[in-house]
Amino acid sequence: MKRPLFYSSVLPFFRSSAHLFTLLLTPPSRFPRELKGYTTQRKSDLTGAVSVVSPSDLAKQNENNPIKAMQGRVPGMNISADGSPSGNATVRIRGVGTLNNNDPLYIIDGVPTKAGMHELNGNDIESIQVLKDAASASIYGSRAANGVIIITTKKGKDGKVRIDFDASIAVQTYAHKMEVLNAKEFGQVMWQGYVNDGLDPNSNGLGYKYDWTYNAQGQPVLNNISMSKYLDAAGTTPAADTDWFAETTRNGLIQQYNVSLSNGSERGTSFFSLGYYKNKGIINSSDFERYSARMNTEYKLLKINDKNLVTVGEHFTLNRTSEVVAPGGFLQNVLQFNPSLPVYTTDGQYAGPVGGYPDRENPVARLDRNSDNRYSYWRTFGDVFLNINPLKDFNIKTTFGIDYAQKQQRIFTYPVTEGTVANATNGVEAKQEHWTKWMWNAIATYAFEKGSHRADAMVGIELNREDDVWFSGKKYDYAVLTTDYMWPNAGVGEAEAYGSGEGYTLVSYFGKLNYNFADRYLLSLTMRYDGSSRFGKNNRYGIFPSVSFGWRINEEKFLKDVSWLDNLKLRASWGQTGNQEISNIARYTLYESNYGEANFGGQSYGTSYDIAGTNGGQTLPSGFKRNQLGNDDLKWETTTQTNIGLDFGILRNSIYGSLEWYFKKTKDILVYMPGIGVMGEGSSQWINAGEVENKGIELNVGYRGNIGDFQYDLSGNIGTYRNKVTKLPETIAANGTFGGNGVESVVGHPMYSQVGYVYDGIFKSQEEIDNHATQNGAGLGRIRWKDLNGDGIINEADQQWIYDPTPDFTWGLNIYLQYKSFDFTMFWQGVQGVDVISDLKKETDLWSGLNISNLNKGRRLLDAWSPTNNGSNIPAISTMDNNNEKRVSTYFVENGSFAKLRTIQFGYNFPKNICEKLYAERLRMYISAQNLLTISSKNFTGVDPENANYGYPIPLNITFGLNVSF
């Protein structure tokens, strides 16, 4: 792979930098604080849209990735993930606001990152807050347009030494499984396809032999199916009936162990933890393993007159993860591989396709060859800080943070000899990548209180740097095919080497002012000024302001005597945030080397000149070609958001909740504009050209209380949003990249919405065919397309918008019950009114799905239309696709709504007398199940609407756990 050359990333007075590292301030102790972010603030004083998630709720999910466990717990935050052992997840807060990276910014103990949260030990988390509106997030400026998630890890508390130990083990199994044809059913369906097409089924070339005839009504009747004993002439590949899902999957196992030690005194606190997590996935050989260690300390070094003058501390974690990832497209490979083929030949080798069977790798062999492709990943992440409190209510804090990661992997290529699939190549690629991110900041805060007036102010500066360096070496032809031997130096064949590096700088100045009058009227002002080396010299700096107001209505005199009203606060905010998530070299004119004369399709793409004029004679062995035009006017994407919210609590806050409305518009979206031919080679360029709108409503409500020893807490949330692309360059809006399938412009429609044909049933009689519009490929049992424009011809003009990826709403419901020492938790999560495009349906409903014959299919084909099964809506089986039934159409757009029982847990806390006998302070045992039940639309034909196609299956987990404290 070639990388661009000649770039630099330099601000006028700093080298280029990475992530903006934030910090957590310690406020004056006389102001009790509840929520923590860039600064801290009383929850009652908040004027922005902030959601808080309890780590104890997340722990019940038994997820490796704490962010994945937040599914359904925050209105307006959509999380999608498959069931892979590493637990990677995609997070979207309040819709999709850009054509580029839509991931939120994570702040861990004040240090920002966009790297994977599956590397973080969720057991170390103390609190999680989600900042959703611009007033809350604008203090993070240029990287906060997609929302901010703040994670604070645990620290020691005053008192005696405390030791906590947590252990759990979980068994995983398939919650939903693809139903595919077995060998006999495959033969039956193939026979029907041949007969429907007027072909001789005994000419199939797969070893199937049919005894069949026509009945008195002229309908074909299958009497018997048989197969040759061996599928190949050599007699080494016996006919089989292989369940390839059973051969390539297993019951998975998750083990998790955590131990922590914490202590604290008036001079300081400390927290240490060790963790281990291992997930053996339900696909054979796939697994994820993590070792983690954390140290958080804080010490007061200088104390004068009971006043802490100097405090130092740190938060550091060291993690080592490793993973074997299931091969790409593996489940599709399993579905398609023919059940008539065995796993092994008679001589113990992996079997493969023979005769007329299509070329596909044996799935079991493919997993075996992939099992050595493990990566290892080391990451150290954290900060050290110095806090000085020289005057009353005046505080200065400086922090240095680092995020360093290193990834290593060898990718092995082993020879393949499986029937007609053969490749003698062997080799190995050794890869390394290093990410280095650092930040330094200095922040001063001042708090003021007099009478009914209370205010605090903050100003700060921050510097960030990020570098990414990678290199890779390949070597071929090894004498010994073992992992111990296959290092690049041992190969004797061709060698290849690649490598590159890049980075960027971010410098920031920011400030914030909060004002509170009489605990009734609240005002907050924020300003951030960012400069990034990713942008052109004419627009390198950006300003991100916000303002928010709050009115605590329940504190007004006219409501003071309303005893049942505990909290009623109206909030309103406006602000701007930015997005700079593009390539570090987007603003540069790029060239790459292209030596010699490269020919493709009869055209020369090299940069050398044929001096001799002999069309391939002497050439100048040098040259560079342009890949990209620079743009000195490139600038930030800017998201402007308005938010109105209402917080309420009644009956001693037993009923509580919040309601939010928001509107946000992103403009100057960064778009990679393809060049036109008349501008010459390499005329593509990054520009600011797009606009997207998102608007929505969020509701969170809860009810809690107790009846004697019985306690309960019921809470639910619902969120809805609408997305629309409002501006794009015409050539991009209509090319299908962001929606429209290249047929219609996506402007005015939700991002990634699609255009296609409308399914109008199955032709079930010749009369229906004759009365329908002219349609190429029309026939009995074939799909009928709707003539939308009424011109009597089915063509491209008969397409409309058929797919919208935006759900009507998402929701979550949490039920917590406790009676004495017993507790019960049940959590439901769901999505309503969302479209999914089922690529899987092309394999379950169409025999000619990929225009490759003899691939296995789904069992739905057993109910395909035929003259004797006239009521079916599944197209008739055919070896051909004359009707182009694979085209994008409503036949493959299905209702992806679902409700999932994410977690159900029963727990028991042992009584104090038993704990004392075990020298324990607390002892709890529990059993739980995850993904126990899924309720989906009756019209959904796939496996799992949450994971509608070929993603790693989401398993059902049964977990046994233990929590003990000393």
Q: For each of these PLM feature ranges, what is it?
A:
Residues A167, L274-K278, L523-S532, W574:
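Transmembrane beta-strand segments that form the barrel wall of outer-membrane beta-barrel proteins
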Residues G97-L99, N263-R267, Y276, L301-N305, ...:
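A generic beta-sheet turn/junction motif
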